[in-house]
Amino acid sequence: MSNKKADSKPQAKYPVNLLDTPFPMRGDLPKREPQWVKEWEARGIYEKIRAASQGRPKFILHDGPPYANGDIHLGHAVNKILKDIVVKSRNMAGFDAPYVPGWDCHGMPIEIQIEKQFGKSLPAAEVMSKARAYATEQIEKQKVGFKRLGVLGDWANPYKTMNFVNEAEEIRALGKIIEKGYVYRGLKPVNWCFDCGSALAEAEVEYKDRTDPTIDVMFAFAEPEKTAHAFGLPALPRAEGGIVIWTTTPWTIPANQALNLHPEIIYALVDTERGLLIIAEERVEACMTDFKLTGRVVATAPGVKLANLRFHHPLASAHPGYKRTAPVYLGDYVTTDTGTGVVHSSPAYGIEDFMSCKAHGMTDSDFINPVMGDGRYIESLPLFGGLSIWDANPKIVDALNAAGSLLRSEKYTHSYMHCWRHKTPIIYRATSQWFAGMDVTPQDGGKTLRETALEGVDATAFYPSWGKQRLFSMIANRPDWTLSRQRQWGVPMAFFVHKETGELHPRTLELLEEVAKRVEQSGIEAWQSLDPRELIGDDANLYEKNRDTLDVWFDSGTTHWHVLRGSHKDQLQFPADLYLEGSDQHRGWFHSSLLTASMIDGRAPYKGLLTHGFTVDGEGRKMSKSLGNGIDPHEVANRLGAEIIRLWIASTDYSGELAISEEILKRVTEGYRRIRNTLRFLLANLSDFDFAQHAVPVDEWLEIDRYAVAFSQQLQTELLGHYEKYEFHPVVAKLQTYCSEDLGGFYLDVLKDRLYTSAADSRARRSAQTALYHLTHGLLRVLAPFLSFTAEEAWKVFQPASDTIFTETYYAYPEVAGSAALIEKWALLRDVRGSVTKALEEARTANRIGSSLQAEVAVHASGARYDALTSLGDDLKFVLITSAATVVKVDDEAQESVDVAASKYQKCERCWHYREDVGAHAEHPTLCGRCFSNLFENGEIRSAA
């Protein structure tokens, strides 16, 4: 280490111990950080951490894989840096905490990119080959971005869902859940995107406002006598009229097959200008106003009395193709919040409609399903064949009006389902898909998937705790999981299905293993090119390859199987200690992982779930291109340093939204400078200190040094408690207070006189340096998880022989005898010092003194304060940073005060104290007695400070 004098003017004659350090005041982070990234990689620092951690208890944070598409954004930075802080803090806490990053590689976004670049007519094999190449290129690009943020991990050996071994293990995982009896095939309404041409998972659906036509439509009486009887009438007063429904999806009217009423709601038969209308009694007044009609209630009946009545389709008079009737089915899901209290049911396009019609005896072959996968009606649909459903909406409204069935039509803005990729509206559409049944009893007769998953939620620790109820209610209320997708770039559901019955081949489990072996060698392309005869021989005449692929949420949702216990089983283990993602993953990765592990293992794949919020600007607005308020982590790293991003994330309560703006970054940068200046002071004042040669035993330290170490040890205990619970913002807040107030504002301030003016090798100075040595060890380690670049830079100056700070564990401070009493005593002294500082400031403002060293103070104190102050003896002046200090005993707190007077003595040229003995030695007329002693004799004796 360097031992240069920082200022040669006064020191030339009477030197002070003002030392320098190669740790610069300016961080110059954008320039230095990339050099550290290169050095960490070149020197294999991650591997050294792993070697140092060998044999310790494992802590596994399992990386939720980002999608291998596009540049990293601020949300990625938040996620990866939080993970890095967790992993580094767990390693330093004495765990073996590896970090294996991963990527999600299959699925629609990459297929879309390939279509954009090469068109839609590529053969499947070529789509796969180009998709693999594209994903690889994107991963490499993102990898550079993540490393630049200071994230340490096994970047040379990440997991990728498209690696052959992972693809093969996914097929084996599918085999496991089939064997256990969770998988079935059925016709069911699923989230369907016309642009994807595929079913969507719940997590791929987002809600946005959309304006649609809302219509009230009458289904005319088909059984007037039965209807009259249901209402307790001998006959209907008139023939015209019917039952009225309200819907926001006119396009579903052509597929109507039933009407739903609540069994307990009271329905009214209302005589109006448009005939007799059946409406829920409590909606009559609102509906009459909406329809611009006047009405008189003729009779009422509960819904249960109207069950099985039939009504004509509202387009029956418009085209013979609609000459059918709709029965009334009872359903508890019907409400009277809006509309008419009557729900029209198109079972192919709604979950509740589907369940209701199934419960009333309809079979799959009974369902009318005229909407094709691209969103157009089949050509044979009367009146609207070939039209897209959205284009058909106004035409259907017109046709209903012409048929005399329309009572009202207006525009309605509501929150509606959209595809998260295409941002286009989606629908429920009944298709034949493979499902994992939430309420299916498995083969072993055990608990259902829903029951097992809910138990898994209960057994998991949540950070923050509100996540538990959120995930619990999602699992409790979710439908069966649609496992199948109609895509090319995905892991195949590698079944052979009977050409006529759709049944699985009887040897399915065995065949899945055969396919998995081939995929392990050649990737999913092996299934694409497989001739069925190779595996099933002549059965190929009866069975064909299933063309569906697995939902990509199954890819990432089974990483606990194909990564933790598969491709990276030597480094990782099951279950993981922690999954850490954004709060949207309660319905995404947390959710799918829980379901797959519940099916395969009967438990959750994680012990803990940590969720963080999303980034917003300084005014709390979401970041968007239209607002122009987005912040690019690359730009910030290149301008201010990745360390500033890391400090911003660590200092923010991530359980809510994370606000960022230039003003916020400016404040973070100021906080960073304070920490850096503290480190620079510590390192400079240790630059001539060799612990082996100069360390002073604890029991010989000055009292304030023992206090500083005891206080720092107590603080570290608090900080490690926060780290343990993943509470990083209190860690940062307490460390910033520690650096600016406990060290900079007190201990280091008091220490300057002793460090600079005591004899270089005196016990007093070496005691201070020994304490600073321990403080620096402790401080750098607790900073390292979040201020990784700065801690490493300081560590290389502090411990140049050590490879890296990241192989260290949290510091074991030396034990200080009576530490609790010492901390309590010095809390009192610091309180008094605060009062003295205030009095000095008032004297300075009144021009009675210049600096605090020009002052002599008398502290009037009582009780414990008096005892604490007098125990310091003559060292009290050093604690108060005055040239003289006396203590006057008073009876009680009310009499306590501070008197400040300007010293009448001369100022020492070297230590700047005003002392009576300045010039006592004629040959040194500007030097005080203690400086003379420190320079030319045995040096002053201090005991406390």
UniProtKB/Swiss-Prot annotation:
Its main location: cytoplasm. Its EC number is 6.1.1.5. GO terms for molecular function: aminoacyl-tRNA deacylase activity; ATP binding; isoleucine-tRNA ligase activity; tRNA binding; zinc ion binding. GO terms for cellular component: cytosol. Keywords: Aminoacyl-tRNA synthetase, ATP-binding, Cytoplasm, Ligase, Metal-binding, Nucleotide-binding, Protein biosynthesis, Zinc. A motif ('HIGH' region) lies at residues 66-76. One of its GO terms (biological process) is isoleucyl-tRNA aminoacylation. ATP binds at K625. Its cofactor is Zn(2+). It comes from the Bacteria. L-isoleucyl-5'-AMP binds at E581. Zn(2+) binds at C908, C911, C928, C931. Belongs to the class-I aminoacyl-tRNA synthetase family. IleS type 1 subfamily. Monomer. IleRS has two distinct active sites: one for aminoacylation and one for editing. The misactivated valine is translocated from the active site to the editing site, which sterically excludes the correctly activated isoleucine. The single editing site contains two valyl binding pockets, one specific for each substrate (Val-AMP or Val-tRNA(Ile)). Catalyzes the attachment of isoleucine to tRNA(Ile). As IleRS can inadvertently accommodate and process structurally similar amino acids such as valine, to avoid such errors it has two additional distinct tRNA(Ile)-dependent editing activities. One activity is designated as 'pretransfer' editing and involves the hydrolysis of activated Val-AMP. The other activity is designated 'posttransfer' editing and involves deacylation of mischarged Val-tRNA(Ile). This is Isoleucine--tRNA ligase. It comes from Burkholderia cenocepacia (strain HI2424).
